[in-house]
C-alpha cells in the first residue's frame, strides 16, 4: 500500500473532465488516457485479463486463491475515472500538507485562496494528519481517483501477500459518472460479480446504500417578440413566463434549504430572450412518492401556464435519470452489514447516511448488481477547496481488504 499516494498523485495530473454537452461516449477522449494507464498497471500486477473496451470501461479479475469447498462470493470494487465538469481538472498541482496544524491552509497566495477551518470545520478532524489539497486553480480529483488508487493498492497487497486467502475479485473503472452516464454501457454479465461496492464516498466512515431518485427537466418557453413601442396586448415575453413558472415551485425546496432526506428542485440553467427561453432543472428526492409528486407539481404548473398563455407556450420534457438503490440493497443487506463490520474491525466508525446525489452503484443496483458506496476520505468535491486525508485513504484500502477477508472465511 506504500505506493498509494504516488499512484493518486499521478492519476490526478491526467485531465479526465467529462462534458455534459458532448454527444460522444465517453464524453471526452482524455478519459482513455487514464484508462490505458490503469490497464497497464493492472497487468503489471498480474491481472492478465485487464482490458479497456471501446467505451472506455476498464475491467480486470484477481482469481481466487482459496482452497475450500465453501462457496465464496465474487466481489466487485468500482470507481470512476472522470472528474466533474464543474471546475477545471487540467494541470492539477496537488499540494501536500504534512502534520496539519489545524490552521488556515494557503492554497494560492497570489489569488488569496484559503482553505480555512472557519469555512470547512471538518478540517479540525485532521490535525496531525497529512492532507492533499489543490493549488486553488483546479479541483483535485479525489472524486474519484482516490477510489481508483485505493482499489489498486488493495489488489497490490493481495498480489504481494499470496498467503492471504481471498475469493475472486473483480474491479472496474468507469467513464462519465459525473455526467450521469457511468453505467450506460457497463456490461454487468461480463463483469461477473455477485455484488459490488463503489469506492466513491466522502469522509472516512461513510457507508451508503440510499440515494436520491433523480430526474432531469427541460423547459422551452415560446414568446412573441414585438417592437416595444407597439407591443401593447401583443408582446409575450418568454423570460417572464419562465420566471413565473419558477416562482410556482416551492421556495423551501431548493438545495440551499434542504438536508438529510429532504428533496429539492434546482434550476441548473436559464438562457433566453423575449422570443424564446430555455430552462433546465433537476428534481431529487429519496422518497419515491415525493419524487413523483415533485414531477407532477412541475407538470401541473406548466399545464396551468399553457392554459393561461395558450397551448404550446411551454414545452416540458421530464427524464428519469436514476432511482434510490435502497429497494435493491435491502434484500441483500449482508453486503452493508459486512462493510459495517469491516470498518469497525479496522478502527473506523461507520457513518451510515443517505447519499444526497447518486453513484454508478445506484444504477448498477437496478441492473442486477447490488452496489452500496464506501468512503474515499475526500472532502469538498467538485471545486478548488477539495482535499483528502492520506490516512483516510489507507483506511479505505484496509476496509476493502477486510471485506474481502470476511467473505473468504
Swiss-Prot record:
<feature type="binding site">
    <location>
        <position position="178"/>
    </location>
    <ligand>
        <name>Zn(2+) 2</name>
    </ligand>
</feature>
<dbReference type="GO" id="GO:0006508">
    <property type="term" value="P:proteolysis"/>
</dbReference>
<keyword id="KW-0031">Aminopeptidase</keyword>
<comment type="function">
    <text>Cleaves the N-terminal amino acid of tripeptides.</text>
</comment>
<feature type="binding site">
    <location>
        <position position="80"/>
    </location>
    <ligand>
        <name>Zn(2+) 1</name>
    </ligand>
</feature>
<protein>
    <recommendedName>
        <fullName>Peptidase T</fullName>
        <ecNumber>3.4.11.4</ecNumber>
    </recommendedName>
</protein>
<keyword id="KW-0645">Protease</keyword>
<feature type="active site" description="Proton acceptor">
    <location>
        <position position="177"/>
    </location>
</feature>
<dbReference type="InterPro" id="IPR010161">
    <property type="entry name" value="Peptidase_M20B"/>
</dbReference>
<keyword id="KW-0479">Metal-binding</keyword>
<dbReference type="Pfam" id="PF01546">
    <property type="entry name" value="Peptidase_M20"/>
</dbReference>
<keyword id="KW-0378">Hydrolase</keyword>
<dbReference type="InterPro" id="IPR011650">
    <property type="entry name" value="Peptidase_M20_dimer"/>
</dbReference>
<feature type="binding site">
    <location>
        <position position="200"/>
    </location>
    <ligand>
        <name>Zn(2+) 1</name>
    </ligand>
</feature>
<keyword id="KW-0963">Cytoplasm</keyword>
<dbReference type="Pfam" id="PF07687">
    <property type="entry name" value="M20_dimer"/>
</dbReference>
<comment type="similarity">
    <text>Belongs to the peptidase M20B family.</text>
</comment>
<dbReference type="InterPro" id="IPR002933">
    <property type="entry name" value="Peptidase_M20"/>
</dbReference>
<dbReference type="GO" id="GO:0008270">
    <property type="term" value="F:zinc ion binding"/>
</dbReference>
<feature type="binding site">
    <location>
        <position position="382"/>
    </location>
    <ligand>
        <name>Zn(2+) 2</name>
    </ligand>
</feature>
<dbReference type="GO" id="GO:0005829">
    <property type="term" value="C:cytosol"/>
</dbReference>
<dbReference type="InterPro" id="IPR001261">
    <property type="entry name" value="ArgE/DapE_CS"/>
</dbReference>
<feature type="binding site">
    <location>
        <position position="143"/>
    </location>
    <ligand>
        <name>Zn(2+) 1</name>
    </ligand>
</feature>
<keyword id="KW-0862">Zinc</keyword>
<dbReference type="GO" id="GO:0043171">
    <property type="term" value="P:peptide catabolic process"/>
</dbReference>
<keyword id="KW-0482">Metalloprotease</keyword>
<feature type="binding site">
    <location>
        <position position="143"/>
    </location>
    <ligand>
        <name>Zn(2+) 2</name>
    </ligand>
</feature>
<dbReference type="GO" id="GO:0008237">
    <property type="term" value="F:metallopeptidase activity"/>
</dbReference>
<dbReference type="InterPro" id="IPR036264">
    <property type="entry name" value="Bact_exopeptidase_dim_dom"/>
</dbReference>
<feature type="active site">
    <location>
        <position position="82"/>
    </location>
</feature>
<dbReference type="GO" id="GO:0045148">
    <property type="term" value="F:tripeptide aminopeptidase activity"/>
</dbReference>
